[in-house]
Amino acid sequence: MATSVDQISKSLSTLGLQDLPVFREADIHHNPVDVYRSYISSELSKINGVDVSLIYPALETSISKDSADLNLPVPRLRVKGKPQELAQKWAEAFPKDLVEVTANGIFLRFNFNGPSLTKLILPIIWEQRENYGRNESGSGKVAVIEFSSPNIAKPFHAGHLRSTIIGSFLANLHESQGWKVHRVNYLGDWGKQFGLLAIGYKKYGDEDQLKSNPIRHLYDVYVKVNADATEEDEKIQKDKAEAESKGLPYTPPLSLHDKAREFFKRMEDGDEESLKVWARFRDLSITKLKDTYDRLNIHYDEYDGESQVSLELMNKMVDELRSLNLIEEDGGALLIDLSKHDKKLGKAIVQKRDGTTLYLTRDIGTAYKRYEKYKFDKSIYVVSSQQDMYFSQLFKIFELMGFDWAKKCVHINYGLVQGMSTRKGKAVFLDDIMEVAKEEMHKVMQKNEEKYAQVENPEEVADIVGKTAIRIQDSTGKRINNYAFDWSRMTSFEGDTGPYLQYAHSRLSSVRRNVNYTDEEIMGANLELLTEPDAYDLVRLLGQYPDVLKNAFRFQETSTVVTYLFKLTHAVSKLYDILWVRGRERDIQLARLALFGAAKQVLNNGMTLLGLTPLERM
């Protein structure tokens, strides 16, 4: 088995072909299909005289089984003559050794020769292993990706779950394309709710519970004090109405909400005691969040938050807005009338009447600070589509302030999750969601007593498969679409689900375990022994993986990779009854192990990119 793309290029030369031309878009060392793109561009240019730089980008890919490996719409080359006739003429003149070329209307369809494709693709995968599909196109570029971003003392709701899954994938994807990525969790850790929380903790707080599970306990405290505040407000309104009915003056008492606002104002003014209480709640919550994210194979380079923008920086941003004549005053509040620049954007408030800031002000300061720190080429905010208007306003403000990096900011939005609840009630915390998924998966596994008895660590396997189920259900459709959270469907081994993906990987692992060959022996396999059409179909799919990642990167879509992985697993499943390994002669075994091993590697790479832990046994 050849072991490098250089050797493949040399083998093309020995067939009487010229060395492959160099294209800016081509990356033959990381993407084997680019070898064919380069070869086709070179050969077609000899036939029709069109410059190769025009032919190469006109070659279109498709992962549909019924489509050609590459298609070329003849009109894109702008050659005089009827496109149908040109397509037919060029197809007849094209060399027949490595590529089968047919004319289909105005299209040229290129199908790669199965044996040559197999000799190209499989050695590359075995050589590059976990690096197969990765490239260096983003080398030297920096991306800051802000995702998850829950609010302290509030539930980790479905929107945060989607942001976590999509954001972690985008971070992994950017790294796979050579980018330097900074993962940021921008916490909702500032605001009046902390005043309410501090008041509530004095009444309902428990130190042991706070240390054991700070996020859950602070949420419980917040719910209770909020209920107190609501009850108090209702009483104040009732007392006021009663006094007014009797013609008596009424002076409302200082409410819990009033006290909360005062507490937050002290925080903004730098009061040490108030900040000490807040900092303790924040630090304990972050410690717990880190444990939760670790369980999902997610890490952050920075835990940022609204609190981390200094008052000095926010004042600087407001002063800058004033100097640009963008600030207007309305009843003591400061706002920007963006409708003057875009009617759809309306007005955006940057400072309340009492002088306290809003998250818009803090987001402006945060973005400014972030660029000064990272000098990013791209800053991604992974936030639901409900915030589309907000980010349009924010980015417009960046533009009006003259920030050169304004166009480098991107809002990656997503739809809603509907009906996310457990069979025992509402699952409002990420830990709850994962625990229920684990329990549900464990129940499914226990239904097959024979297989369950063979699993060495069923609790750990159930946990991994449960987390896979959550991620895959969220990632199957386009991110902008809403989807219904379905526990039964999600935890099924039937259909295109997370559990099925894990099963497919573990089954591929078992193929290798059933025979005793070294990697070196498999890499020396005679690939000419792979002659079955279904084997060539699988090789074609394996060769498409680098392009799949490029498309996922282009559209920032998790579903692009997930859809591909299911196509891959279906193609592999079809081969189990055709390409037996056990009981076959040695050379046949090695060739088939080379194919199944490459399939496992690509499946593993894709699953890892999605943030999953591929299982060897289950």
Swiss-Prot record:
Keyword Zinc: no
Keyword ATP-binding among record annotations: yes
Motif 'HIGH' region in this chain: 149-160
EC number, as in UniProt: 6.1.1.19
Keyword annotations of the record: Aminoacyl-tRNA synthetase, ATP-binding, Cytoplasm, Ligase, Nucleotide-binding, Protein biosynthesis
GO BP term (any one): cytoplasmic translation
Pfam family, one: Arg_tRNA_synt_N
Major localisation: cytoplasm
Catalytic activities: tRNA(Arg) + L-arginine + ATP = L-arginyl-tRNA(Arg) + AMP + diphosphate
InterPro entries: aa-tRNA-synth_I_CS, Arg-tRNA-ligase, Arg-tRNA-synth_N, Arg-tRNA-synth_N_sf, ArgRS_core, DALR_anticod-bd, Rossmann-like_a/b/a_fold, tRNAsynth_Ia_anticodon-bd
Binding locations of L-arginine: 146-151, 160, 359, 363, 387
Recorded GO MF terms: arginine-tRNA ligase activity; ATP binding
SMART domains assigned to the protein according to its UniProt record, in alphabetical order: Arg_tRNA_synt_N, DALR_1
Function: Forms part of a macromolecular complex that catalyzes the attachment of specific amino acids to cognate tRNAs during protein synthesis.
Family note: Belongs to the class-I aminoacyl-tRNA synthetase family.
Protein name: Probable arginine--tRNA ligase, cytoplasmic
Organism, scientific name: Schizosaccharomyces pombe (strain 972 / ATCC 24843) (Fission yeast)
Phylogenetic lineage: Eukaryota, Fungi, Dikarya, Ascomycota, Taphrinomycotina
